[in-house]
Amino acid sequence: MIQTESRLQVADNTGASEVLCIKVLGGSKRRYASIGDVIKVSVKSAAPRGRVKKGDIYNAVVVRTAKGVRRPDGSLIKFDANAAVLLNAKLEPIGTRIFGPVTRELRTEKFMKIVSLAPEVI
């Protein structure tokens, strides 16, 4: 469950290591984002020679949350930390690699590229 001012780890190789959620996209009254939701983020810390730099604003998709996601069979998938993958304006991933597991909830037409790059799909 991600809201404005939430800090997330970055699960790709763009060079960013931490981002801050500045807006949950999808309606003016929308407060929380979960796995598979698109948010607007600001880069808070980045590697010196990465693709992105500190202060840049990007779209991102949430790939892991500590709150978890409930499956129809009743199981709950939780992670140790919140993580996101940075996206460009066309909602395509900026990075070429994804680190760590992602959930099956990302298997929509929009994010199949992220699922195919991920080392593990839970």
Curated annotation (Swiss-Prot):
One of its GO terms (cellular component) is cytosolic large ribosomal subunit. Keywords: Ribonucleoprotein, Ribosomal protein, RNA-binding, rRNA-binding. This is Large ribosomal subunit protein uL14. Binds to 23S rRNA. Forms part of two intersubunit bridges in the 70S ribosome. The lineage of its organism: Bacteria, Pseudomonadati, Pseudomonadota, Betaproteobacteria, Burkholderiales. It comes from the Bacteria. The keyword Iron does not apply. Belongs to the universal ribosomal protein uL14 family. HAMAP family: Ribosomal_uL14. GO terms for biological process: translation.
